[in-house]
Amino acid sequence: MKKWFLVCLMFVTLLALADGHGDLGLEKRQPDAPMNVTSVVLGEDVTSVSAEGDMEGYGKVYVTYHLSYNAARTGGTVDGQGRGFTPDGYASGRFQGFWELVDGVVVMRNVVNITDNTMNLDVIKFNPLTRELVVQAYILK
């Protein structure tokens, strides 16, 4: 099952690497969501980035990204989870994907499985110089 998921994840990631997400015909789930980076923990094998912000449909969101490095240390895999809280309750999501360094910006592309039985392709851009982090969420399911 895990291998099947990784194969599907790689397929979706290859699509995400194409220029222009509009070309894929994916619809945005919500407006782009700027987040406040609350911590960056550097490690030899993994760096963790935590952020919080408001997202349409999910409320106040807290998320942590765990980035593992490739041999060149310019990309690798990413996994993590997030929680969103609204007056009506909460949602939880787990994600896996890949990241790369593009012109000094960390670009993550993740498949997100959310407890409300929805699935997103999230494209996250994190600029370590300015601490800007923006989440673009596209509907997969």
Write out the residue ranges for each language-model feature.
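Positively charged n-region of N-terminal signal peptides that target proteins for export
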Residues: 1-4
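Hydrophobic h-region of N-terminal signal peptides that target proteins for export
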Residues: 10-17
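Beta-strand-enriched cores of mature, soluble protein domains
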Residues: 18-141
